[in-house]
């Protein structure tokens, strides 16, 4: 059995005991998070969400992804600008899926 949940502006397909990476959430390691925005669970589609369904996850880690380097070049001026970016993420483990 799997479910489709919404976190931020993205959707994730999850199963029990899955570990997923989502956009950074303001939670501490070890906390439990309940997602109420469930689009699909156990062959039931929501309109837009399944009533009473929820997915419970545990926060395993807060971190940042690998660095992405971006170079901006301005032509005819021999000028370069170098930028770096590391996207923060939260690693979650699916603990329970409730049908509702």
From Swiss-Prot:
This is Large ribosomal subunit protein bL21. InterPro entries: bL21-like, bL21-like_sf, Ribosomal_bL21, Ribosomal_bL21_CS. The keyword Isomerase does not apply. It comes from Mycoplasmoides gallisepticum (strain R(low / passage 15 / clone 2)) (Mycoplasma gallisepticum). GO terms for biological process: translation. This protein binds to 23S rRNA in the presence of protein L20. It comes from the Bacteria. Belongs to the bacterial ribosomal protein bL21 family. Part of the 50S ribosomal subunit. Contacts protein L20. One of its GO terms (molecular function) is rRNA binding. Keywords: Ribonucleoprotein, Ribosomal protein, RNA-binding, rRNA-binding. GO terms for cellular component: cytoplasm; ribonucleoprotein complex; ribosome.
């Amino acid at each position: 059995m799997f479910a489709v949940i919404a976190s931020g502006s993205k959707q994730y397909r999850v199963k029990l005991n899955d570990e997923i990476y989502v956009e950074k959430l303001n939670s501490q390691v070890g906390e439990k998070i309940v997602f109420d925005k469930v689009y699909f669970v156990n062959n039931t589609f929501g309109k837009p969400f399944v009533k009473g369904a929820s997915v419970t996850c545990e926060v395993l880690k807060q971190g940042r992804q690998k660095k992405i380097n971006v170079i901006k070049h301005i032509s005819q001026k021999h000028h370069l600008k170098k930028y770096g970016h590391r996207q923060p993420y939260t690693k979650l483990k699916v603990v329970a899926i409730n049908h509702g």
